[in-house]
Amino acid sequence: MQAGVSVPHYQGMAGELQPLPVLIITSVALLVTGVVMISSASMDMAAATLGNSYHYVIRQILFAGLGCATALVAVNVPVSWWERSGWLLLGIGLLVLVLVLTPLGRTVNGSTRWIPMGLFNVQVSEVAKLCLIAYLAGYVVRRREELLHTWPGFLKPLGVLGVASVLLVIQPDFGATVVLVTAAAGMIFLSGVRLSRFMPLIGVLAALGTILVVTQPYRLKRVISYLDPWKDQFDSGYQLTQSLIAFGRGEWVGVGLGNSVQKLFFLPEAHTDFIYAIIAEEFGLLGALVVLGLFAALVVSGLVIARRAEKAGMAFGACFSYGITLLIGLQAGINMAVSTGLLPTKGLTLPLVSYGGSSLMVTCIGIAVIARVELERQDRARVASETKGNRTKGGAVYD
């Protein structure tokens, strides 16, 4: 630690709401919400298909325990380790994206996104997103001047993103591609790159996105059903219409925990991608807004921590925190928007809430990294404050 760093003394200020407790409390609240809602949403399906009503909830409790354990490990890893390990993390991220396309990968519903690891299947896009954001955060810090003032410096990280995006689209995992590219672009923008630099990129991505939709029949059907789900409510629009019915049944305060009808084999993926619709059905619009508010508080606390780190001169910690926060916020926002019909179906889980081991553990690691950044910033502020106090003790400084 550098004792001479001069930063504002934030902690302990009367009446100021600290972001770290907010980050932890909202994360735990969402984690508990997820376990409760998976218990409700999955019981009937688990009983009918697996003969054990508690199959999914028991596994989710185990995943939650593993997530908390990995978070405790991650919060004790210095931020400098992530910065030094950028190339290693990039290699891991790209390697898992390649391995899933080999016979090691597992295909479910036409998508090859998982590698079996015994207890659970690792969704490689979750691992890759965190690894790539860590590498790109390091690049932004190391090559800041080149990134800000030259086109080659700006295009190099986009090349890395391009390779990862191609590997994700091959799986195919279009939703993860959107989240990764948008979060990375947002992180680079927050580092100081002019918005005008992104305009050509936005145009290219829009063109590529259109091509991907038009050339893949299932994506085209999703877009068409998104525009008018009731036109084909028993085929391409089925999932969205059932989700909207769940929201309608919930009204203001819901039908009560465990009383959902849509989870009874009407709404596919009720315990994963569309768990937000079950929350809305059982707890109503008010319950859905509470979950939305928890995610908003989590994202704001993450951004505040990143901003404080930036002011304290912790460039990598700030950039990495921005990236992780954007990953979580974008995925949550897209998932909830899909459930309400604001976006086409993407196949993304709701972070910390939906069933799934790899997504949960990677999210817990990301939150732990943000917490570590804030703890290191507080440590710097305390050392700086103590040093300043020692230098001015007695009202004078003597050589």
Curated annotation (Swiss-Prot):
NCBIfam families per record: ftsW (TIGR02614)
Q: Which UniProt keywords apply?
A: Cell cycle, Cell division, Cell inner membrane, Cell membrane, Cell shape, Cell wall biogenesis/degradation, Glycosyltransferase, Membrane, Peptidoglycan synthesis, Transferase, Transmembrane, Transmembrane helix
Q: Is Transferase set as a keyword in this record?
A: yes
Q: Enumerate the transmembrane spans.
A: 19-39, 61-81, 85-105, 114-134, 160-180, 198-218, 285-305, 314-334, 350-370
The protein's GO terms of the molecular function aspect are: lipid-linked peptidoglycan transporter activity; peptidoglycan glycosyltransferase activity
Q: One Pfam annotation, family name? A: FTSW_RODA_SPOVE
Could you tell me the membrane topology recorded for this protein?
A: Multi-pass membrane protein
Reactions catalysed, semicolon-separated, are: [GlcNAc-(1->4)-Mur2Ac(oyl-L-Ala-gamma-D-Glu-L-Lys-D-Ala-D-Ala)](n)-di-trans,octa-cis-undecaprenyl diphosphate + beta-D-GlcNAc-(1->4)-Mur2Ac(oyl-L-Ala-gamma-D-Glu-L-Lys-D-Ala-D-Ala)-di-trans,octa-cis-undecaprenyl diphosphate = [GlcNAc-(1->4)-Mur2Ac(oyl-L-Ala-gamma-D-Glu-L-Lys-D-Ala-D-Ala)](n+1)-di-trans,octa-cis-undecaprenyl diphosphate + di-trans,octa-cis-undecaprenyl diphosphate + H(+)
Name the gene. Answer: ftsW
InterPro entries hit by this protein: Cell_cycle_FtsW-rel_CS (IPR018365), FtsW (IPR013437), FtsW/RodA (IPR001182)
Location of this chain's protein in the cell: Cell inner membrane
Source domain of life: Bacteria
Q: Does the keyword Cell membrane apply?
A: yes
Question: Per its UniProt record, what PROSITE patterns does this chain match?
Answer: FTSW_RODA_SPOVE
Upper taxonomic lineage: Bacteria, Pseudomonadati, Pseudomonadota, Gammaproteobacteria, Pseudomonadales
- EC? 2.4.99.28
Which pathway does it operate in? Answer: Cell wall biogenesis; peptidoglycan biosynthesis
Membership in a protein family: Belongs to the SEDS family. FtsW subfamily.
What does the function comment of this entry state? Peptidoglycan polymerase that is essential for cell division.
Q: One GO biological process from the UniProt record?
A: cell wall organization
Report what the protein is called.
Probable peptidoglycan glycosyltransferase FtsW
Entry GO terms, CC: cell division site; plasma membrane
